[in-house]
Amino acid sequence: MRMKKLALACALVLGLQTTSLAQWKPAGDRIKTEWGEKLDPANVLPEYPRPMMERKEWKNLNGLWNYAIRPCGEAEPKTYDGEILVPFAIESSLSGVGVHLEDSQELWYTRQFEVPAGWKGKRVLLHFGAVDWRAHVWVNNINVGKHEGGYAPFCFDITDALQKGSNKLTVRVWDPTNNGPQPVGKQANRPQGIWYTAVSGIWQTVWLEPVNENHIASMKITPDIDLNRLRIEARTGESEWKKGCRLEAEVYDNGKLVASGAAVRGEAIDITIPGEVKLWSPDTFFIYTQSTPETKRHRNGCGGQLCSHEKVLVQA
């Protein structure tokens, strides 16, 4: 009986979601493109969002979220105004809303999500490709972080805020456009002439990523063409690594290992590529692939692999 009730509940939720997707439509047809015409609200921007540091496991949170517009300073609304298609700015046609956000207003988002069962024991990172301009983020009503800046990606470790089953994600955004403290471009609250319509709220992919406690957070790769060398600097996600851990980098040419190097945490890895280096140019679109797994030394465990991959462009 319990299983029947659970199956019925799941069917109802699926039915509601299907109906909601079927009801979505663009708000007008401004600046319509062939890609916009083919947009599937159930599969929005499915491409991996960080091609320069790719991991196999991730979960896309793009799609229909609930939204509300409220005066600045108010608490989270008990009821929301409707649905918005993330990651399109609320002013855009593809958001399904297409309204202007005043500098005296805040834009609220919320949705439910579940963490895949296979991620048990991992740290879970919540990524935003970009949110314009100031974003406050909560998971299950727990404040997980704040970010300012409309163009830079950011992420928060939300592991400690998660619960079993469904989780609630809430985002509050304030975007004063040309009336705020941020550097001003050509977006304007009253667009005309050369002044553009503002781009407010979430406007790049939102996604989840499982990582080990010891993981690579970011990488910087500097080529030295004269010496046929790459310098790789990695920033790790933990301030204290277990003893014996180090970073190892491998460079591949169409799947074939051509060079490798290693260094302890905090030090750069210098890798010399043997033979004639294949340089990238507009005429020869060659790309080396660089993989950075975690390695172990002696008997000390390092807690699994970091599993990071990056494309290396060596320009002529």
Locations of the language-model features?
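Repetitive helical segments and hydrophobic/amphipathic motifs
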Residues: 13-14
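Secreted/periplasmic carbohydrate-active enzymes, especially glycoside hydrolases
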Residues: 2-5, 9, 20-316
